[in-house]
């Protein structure tokens, strides 16, 4: 829903593998009267080619599961484990389907963990999704980054811009001015 507030896109379509999460998203869309702009389909990214026509999206966004194998603690609650760990799909699955769904010149935006950055760039390039912009996200200015934001373009030419870092908090519970600006406070 934040995307609908921050973009002029005529329509947004979400794909969610977990039925409960898809239902929750649909209820939120209805409560905010956004049914005319946003739809949610419950389905598997690995089968997106059966749900959507090739090259049918100008933009694809993803907040994929970050952890592989035994990285981090696996949540005993299945829905949370599926959201955080590559249980039902891998980043390669997401990249392969994104390359098929994006129109030539279309953009893929994703958030991931910096410890997987090399793998992400290699995988994106493998599927002709050229990394164009990268921004590291820091929880605090004096900490290591814990997220990376990437934009890749289908069929783009090689050249990546590294944006200035994004810092979330000035101090515990207090956002930086940049974050307030992003969220419109």
Please describe what each predicted stretch is:
Residues 11-16:
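Conserved SAM-binding motif I beta-strand of class I
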Residues 33-45:
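Conserved SAM-binding strand-loop segment of SAM-dependent methyltransferases
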Residues 50-60:
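A short acidic, Gly/Pro-enriched loop at the edge of an enzyme's catalytic core
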Residues 88-145, 149:
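Conserved Class I SAM-dependent methyltransferase catalytic core
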Residues 25-26:
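Conserved SAM-binding loop
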Residues 144-185:
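SAM/dcSAM-binding transferase cores
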Residues 64-93:
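Mobile active-site "lid"/loop adjacent to the S-adenosyl-L-methionine
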Residues 1-10:
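Conserved SAM-binding loop of SAM-dependent methyltransferases across substrates and taxa
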């Amino acid at each position: 829903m934040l995307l609908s507030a921050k973009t002029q896109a005529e329509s947004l379509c979400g794909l969610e593998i977990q039925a409960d999460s898809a239902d929750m998203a649909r209820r939120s869309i209805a409560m905010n009267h956004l049914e005319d702009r946003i739809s949610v389909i419950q389905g598997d990214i690995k089968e997106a080619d059966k749900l959507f026509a090739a090259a049918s999206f100008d933009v694809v966004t993803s907040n994929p599961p970050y952890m592989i194998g035994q990285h981090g603690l696996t949540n005993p609650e299945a829905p949370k484990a599926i959201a955080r760990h590559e249980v039902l799909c891998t980043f390669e699955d997401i990249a392969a389907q994104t390359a098929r769904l994006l129109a030539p010149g279309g953009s893929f935006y994703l958030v991931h963990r910096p410890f997987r950055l090399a793998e992400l760039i290699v995988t994106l390039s493998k599927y002709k999704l050229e990394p164009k912009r990268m921004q590291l996200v820091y929880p605090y200015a004096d900490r290591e980054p814990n997220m990376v934001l990437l934009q890749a373009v289908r069929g783009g030419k090689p050249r990546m811009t590294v944006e200035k870092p994004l810092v979330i908090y000035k101090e515990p519970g207090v956002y930086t001015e940049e974050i307030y600006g992003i969220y419109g406070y």
